[in-house]
Amino acid sequence: FFFCQGTMPAVDQTNGKILMQSKSELCLSPNGHGGMLSALKDSGVLVWCREHNISTLFYSQIDNPLSQIGDPLLLGVHRLSDADVSMQVIEKQHADDRTGNVVLIDDITQMIEYSEMPGELAAQTTTNTNGEEKLRFWASNIAVHTFSTDFLLRMSEDADALPFHLAAKTVRCLENGELVSPTVPNAYKFEQFIFDLLPHAQNTMVVEVERSVAFAPVKNAPEATFSTVATSRATMNELYHRWLTETGCKVNDSAVVEINARFALDQAQLQLRELPEQIDADTYFQL
C-alpha cells in the first residue's frame, strides 16, 4: 500500500489567521506522525488488514538505519502479552536529550515530548538499588512501535483520539501581497502524535533495548555533534566490528565495515555466512 499523509493549514503566530502561499493557495503542512491513523483508515489499509487476518502492524517513523523492521523480540513480547501497543525505549544519555519521555501517569503509560517536558522535571534524578544516581525519567522513545490492528481500528473511529499539538515554525507566506521568507518562527503548525494513543490502550508493553544496537538516528545537519550522517555511520561501524570480532574475524580498527541487512540481520545470521579470517580494508558485505 502507498498512501498520503494528511495536511493542516498553518496559522499566523500573532493573530491566528490562516497563512496564504498565494492568493488562491493555503499554506499547508503535514499533520504529524499521528496523521498515520487517519491515513490508514482513509486508504482502506486497516479494513484490508482485518479482512486478511493481519493482527499486528510494525511502525518506525524516523531515519534510523539500526531499526530492525519487524524486530522479533518486540513482536514476541507484543503477541505474548496480548498488548494493544508495544514500544522500544533506550536509556537517556542526558536530561535534555531531544527524544520523547516514556512515563507513567496514574499508572498509565504515556509519552511526553521533549519540547513539552519542563527542564527541571527532566533533570530530576533518583538512586537505584546499586546506589547509582540515575535520571528519574530515563526511558527515551525511539519511535519504534507495534500496534494491534483491532486497536487501531477502534481508535480510527474516534475523531478525538489524537489531539493537535502546536509547533512554532518558520513558514514562507504572503505578506502585504508579497511572498516572504521569515528568519524567525512566524507560524503555528498543527501536528498529531501517534503516541497519544497510549492512554487509550488497555495493555502497553515497553521494551528497553541497547542504544548501540538499535539507535543510530540521522536527524541533524553535518555540522552538529550528534544524530548526523557521520555519527550514524560511526555507530553502525562499531556494531559491525563487534559482530565480526565475536564471530572470530580479526578486524583492523581503521577499517570501515558495513553489513547489508540481506547479508545478515544480526550476529547470529552473520555466523552462518562465510567470512574472511581478517579484514584490513574498508569492506561492504552484501549478497
Predicted regions and their residues:
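Short acidic donor-binding/metal-coordinating loop in glycosyltransferase active sites
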Residues: 62
